[in-house]
Amino acid sequence: MGCCQSRIDSKEIVSRCKARKRYLKHLVKARQTLSVSHALYLRSLRAVGSSLVHFSSKETPLHLHHNPPSPSPPPPPPPRPPPPPLSPGSETTTWTTTTTSSVLPPPPPPPPPPPPPSSTWDFWDPFIPPPPSSSEEEWEEETTTATRTATGTGSDAAVTTAPTTATPQASSVVSGFSKDTMTTTTTGSELAVVVSRNGKDLMEIIKEVDEYFLKAADSGAPLSSLLEISTSITDFSGHSKSGKMYSSSNYECNLNPTSFWTRGFAPSKLSEYRNAGGVIGGNCIVGSHSSTVDRLYAWEKKLYQEVKYAESIKMDHEKKVEQVRRLEMKRAEYVKTEKAKKDVEKLESQLSVSSQAIQSASNEIIKLRETELYPQLVELVKGLMCMWRSMYESHQVQTHIVQQLKYLNTIPSTEPTSELHRQSTLQLELEVQQWHHSFCNLVKAQRDYIQSLTGWLRLSLFQFSKNPLVRSSYESKIYSFCEEWHLAIDRIPDKVASEGIKSFLTAVHGIVAQQADEHKQKKRTESMLKDFEKKSASLRALESKYSPYSVPESRKKNPVIEKRVKVEMLKGKAEEEKSKHEKSVSVTRAMTLNNLQMGFPHVFQAMVGFSSVCMQAFESVYNQAKSIGEDQEEVKRLLP
């Protein structure tokens, strides 16, 4: 029996169906892993931003910041004097249009229009806050008017303009680039540079970075809906992995993963996403992706069992046919021969039923693949494209925001790092570590998913009732789509982004290590001071015992003098330890700012590069699917 079973499994069609079933089983698990990885990555973005805000709230009072230097005005034409530079301390800059005064020089050229997504400078992004407001629409109208006015005045002009009364809500999310406190300079290459006129502390800068972490996380909401993440993630709690809860109630709320899902989430994003690109080829998504994959797996298991059963019937049928042939050659008894023939007919009937079951299962798989799976896959690619485009824009703005860190400096501080500050730094290190871990898992999950899907498609395109070399146009479409997707995922340079996050993790770990050294030095200083106070009290007691008029028994040994010498030595050591602690505090402050200044640009530049490549890769795959769908619609319209 075992030998017969082995012979059945060795059949090509059985082994093919077994491999198909195995690939689809992996696809079911890969889809679940992708959902979890996607959710955890979005959660990590929110958590890193929240941890940075909490960390900076403890660090900001220990730093002194200064305003950035005033930018020099653009070089004017020879006959025109340059406009006077603006004072860095001024809170607003008066703008006057060219129509209000003929004394002022003509206006400068307006900032260039926003470049395409592939550009490395997304100039207008810093002016776009997440929640739109009416005041910002007025600002855009004023900018458009100024642009039209300045178009005919030449490219070498310089001007100051005066806006209408600004409301408190008119400030940008990136407050350093606020409309009433900015200066735009234009060089010969027409590259607009925005310079902040406001001095900011670390807290304000980090809050802006956090806003775009939230924006990046919110961009994954439509894809979360497609992946049905709400039913996939169940391990939501307010506790960190170390099992600690922090005393600040606001911080506990920020670190609660449930709040990460709701904080700054825009409900309209999903509807905007669905209306963004239309429907590919007139198809609509039927059912959920999870349900579709599960049903495909159920049909693949049924198909495997039916094919395996059919092959066993074929083997029995061949044996019975051979038996009938031998009986006829031997001219055996009529009853035996007829019985064998009836067995053959029975097996043929069973084989016919089994073939119908195989065809039915195969048709159901094809139907699910055509009507549900392919439209869902196109929507997934569209969701990935939109998500990485938004993340590219968010990380690009963050790259510009963190440039303001170079305008911060530290002063020697005697204020030690508090325990809450140390805990917030440890939490930041943990969240950055989780960011790196979730990023690597997300990339791996995407690769495993498309690899399992492509492997299953490669085998499932084989038709049992057709020539295996013949493929329909639809089969070629879905297979070429997934192959292109597979190649795009393989070409993504995730190592660079991973190393960028690791470099930032190393910078944060350096701060943690320095704070730990400072804490140890503080303990040593406190211990030394405590010992000094104890010895000083003992010396005072000894001095009161041996008054100046009392004569010791032995003039060779004076206990007061010996004790005083020891106390003086201990005092020197205590002062030395105190000096070391103060120096350690200053080193901590300087290292904190230096590591942030060095680490932030690297990680955001790496993420900008990665998200840009992802955006372009998925856009290419999506556009290919869209063009194929449009071509097929055109063919349908041309056919009678």
Curated annotation (Swiss-Prot):
Disruption phenotype: Defects in primary root elongation and enhanced root hair elongation. Keywords: Coiled coil, Nucleus. Pfam families: DUF630, DUF632. Induction: Down-regulated by phosphate deficiency. Expressed in the root tip of primary and lateral roots, specifically in the meristematic region, including the quiescent center and lateral root cap cells. Residues 68-87, 104-118 have a biased composition (Pro residues). Residues 60-175 are annotated as: Disordered. Required for the coordination of cell differentiation and cell elongation in the root tip. Required for the coordination of cell processes necessary for correct root growth in response to phosphate starvation, through the modulation of the auxin transporter protein PIN7. This is Protein ALTERED PHOSPHATE STARVATION RESPONSE 1. It comes from Arabidopsis thaliana.
